[in-house]
Curated annotation (Swiss-Prot):
Pathway: Cofactor biosynthesis; ubiquinone biosynthesis [regulation]
Record flagged with keyword Transferase: yes
Record-linked InterPro entries: ABC1_dom, Kinase-like_dom_sf, UbiB, UbiB_bact, UbiB_kinase
Described function: Is probably a protein kinase regulator of UbiI activity which is involved in aerobic coenzyme Q (ubiquinone) biosynthesis.
Protein's name according to its UniProt entry: Probable protein kinase UbiB
Keyword terms, alphabetized: ATP-binding, Cell inner membrane, Cell membrane, Kinase, Membrane, Nucleotide-binding, Transferase, Transmembrane, Transmembrane helix, Ubiquinone biosynthesis
Ranges of residues in domain Protein kinase: 123-501
Protein family according to the UniProt entry: Belongs to the ABC1 family. UbiB subfamily.
Source species of the chain: Shewanella pealeana (strain ATCC 700345 / ANG-SQ1)
Pfam families named in the record: ABC1
Gene Ontology cellular-component annotations: plasma membrane
Membrane topology reported for the UniProt record: Multi-pass membrane protein
Localisation: Cell inner membrane
Length: 549
């Protein structure tokens, strides 16, 4: 470790102790000498004993800076690991940092463009439109067509700072993992690795641009979602240029009501958009918090969403989608046995899991939910409780499902904020049933056959040769099996004959020796011994040789 990283580690530990985070660890992890070392090296006591654990963790992460703030925000979505109280505390973390010098921003932009800003842009505004922990946004006008655009540029040296903090987090997680043991529910190393994947994706702005282009193409003719245009030729790893949009933040319900927005339709479209992205396109926006979602000012009676920041996207396999859809349908049919079977069939939990015990655990969690009307049941909450239950049966973490659960909770929260009477089940059920019918019905079978036709057309001419080769192999195998069987039988016959001669010779020699000791007539005793020795020699010589059959 470098001096700089040691200093950073010291600061992180000191901050954690200042907020008494060590008090939140189980007693077996903090023996008497731990407190002694704490006072010797840091001279610190818990300064926030009056605050609950979740609030102390939030304050510590806030003080440690942007990387830890984003980590806290990510943790707030892992409600399969944290209690609701802790998750709600961490959800209040705000990714707001002072802007960096516009001269440095200009320098970074020109380095990516490999040209002066004035070559491509007019009216570049040195005052940033927004500033966050990873990047900063400036406005300008595109010189080529006069379009209003925004330039998003990474903060200077942000990659080094992020990787340095990630290294510390990984080391701390590994240490905690060893302390907590293999059966711990929190799995800190797994959580940090999940965060690493997320934040490293946000450090590559070119990837964000490509994601936005793909999502835009998926909804190019949609009346429900608009994704701003990306100027791909001006997009790089540390800089992207995109169309500037004018919309109302989805969280500003007062402004939406003031312009007469159809909030019921807007809320229902949000749910439909989510399921369309997941089940139709298999490519969904996984960071749809209110700061990334706007509503168009155009035709409020037929409103549509505007989506920003496509740095974090999710995908599911076809199997994941099928199991997920069946899970929801099984839940609303109260078929808990089927839910347990689906988790095992999908490989999310081990094949040797006790299905009956899992079914009962699911029933205990899910059955009370039906005390509420269907329109009040939360899809995200259902998924969350199922994941929490599955974790008790050693569910293998599924990062794509964690992203899905987080996004679903966001979508539900937004939908019910816009229109509290939103019935998610009535909105989603027809979509899920139609998708399932398309996957398992005659049309699905025909589509799969059609999809495989080019493959079979290419390989069909090889079929006669393959059949001939397989028949020949079968015939040769049959011949070889017969030969092996004959050799085995002969080997066994020789072995039996040899064993018979050796046993007989031993009996004759023993009998001859007994007769000789009893002073009997000599010739029978010597004859018995002689024949026995002869048979022993014959038996020994007739033994089958030890070679492979």
């Amino acid at each position: 470790m470098t001096v700089k990283s040691i200093r950073r580690a010291y600061h992180v530990i000191r901050t954690a102790l200042h907020y008494g985070l060590d008090d939140l660890l189980p007693p077996k992890l903090t023996p008497w000498y731990f407190k002694l070392l704490r006072y010797c090296f840091f001279w610190l006591r818990n300064q926030h004993k009056d605050k609950v654990g979740g609030e102390r963790l939030k304050l510590a992460m806030q003080e440690l800076g942007p990387v830890y703030i984003k980590f806290g925000q990510m943790l707030s979505t892992r409600r399969d690991l944290l209690s609701d109280e802790w998750a709600e505390e961490l959800a209040m973390l705000q990714d707001r940092v002072p802007p960096f010098d516009s001269a440095i921003a200009r320098e970074s932009i020109e380095k990516e463009l490999n040209a002066p800003i004035e070559r491509y842009f007019n009216d570049f505004d040195d005052t940033p439109l927004a500033s966050a922990s990873i990047s900063q946004v400036h406005t300008a006008t595109l010189k080529s067509n006069g379009a209003a655009v925004v330039l998003k540029v990474l903060r200077p040296d942000v990659e080094k700072k992020v990787h340095a903090d990630l290294l510390l987090m990984s080391q701390a997680a590994d240490f905690l993992e060893r302390l907590l043991g293999a059966n711990n529910r929190l799995r800190p190393a797994e959580v940090v690795e999940d965060y690493r994947t997320t934040i490293e994706g946000e450090l590559n702005l070119k990837l964000e641009a490509l994601n936005a282009i793909k999502l835009r193409n998926n909804f190019i003719d949609s009346n429900a979602l608009y994704i701003p245009y990306m100027y791909e030729e001006l997009c790089f790893t540390r800089l992207i240029v995109m169309e500037r949009i004018d919309g109302i933040p989805v969280s500003d319900k007062v402004a939406l009501e003031a312009q007469g927005t159809n909030l019921k339709l807007l809320a229902e479209r949000g749910v439909e958009l989510f399921f369309t992205q997941v089940f139709r396109d298999n490519f969904f926006h996984a960071d749809m918090h209110p700061g990334n979602v706007f509503v168009s000012r155009e035709h409020p009676n037929d409103p549509f969403y505007i989506g920003l920041d496509c740095g974090i996207m999710g995908t599911l396999t076809d199997e994941d989608k099928r199991y997920l859809a069946e899970n929801f349908l099984a839940f609303f049919n109260r078929d808990y046995r089927r839910i347990a079977q689906l988790y095992i069939e999908s490989g999310w939990v081990s094949a040797d899991t006790d299905v009956g015990a899992f079914e009962q655990a699911v029933k205990v969690v899910c059955e009370p939910m039906f005390n509420k009307p269907l329109d009040e049941i939360s899809f995200g909450h259902v998924l969350l409780e199922l994941f929490r239950t599955a974790r008790r049966f050693d569910m293998v973490v599924q990062p794509q499902l964690v992203l899905l659960e987080k996004t679903l909770l966001y979508i539900e929260g937004l939908g019910r904020q816009l229109y509290p009477q939103l019935d998610l089940w009535q909105t989603a059920k027809p979509f899920l049933e139609q998708w399932m019918a398309e996957q398992v019905g005659p049309k699905a079978m025909a589509a799969k056959v059609k999809q495989q036709l080019p493959y079979w057309a290419e390989h069909l001419p090889e079929l006669p040769e393959l059949i001939y080769d397989n028949l020949k192999i079968g015939r040769d195998l049959s011949k070889n099996q017969n030969k092996l069987l004959d050799r085995y039988l002969k080997h066994q016959q020789k072995a039996h004959k040899s064993n018979y001669l050796l046993i007989t010779s031993a009996i004759l020699v023993i009998c001859g020796t007994i007769l000789l000791n009893q002073d009997a007539t000599l010739w029978p005793s010597y004859g018995s011994i002689g024949i026995g020795i002869t048979l022993w020699v014959l038996g020994w010589r007739s033994r089958p040789k030890n070679r492979k059959i």
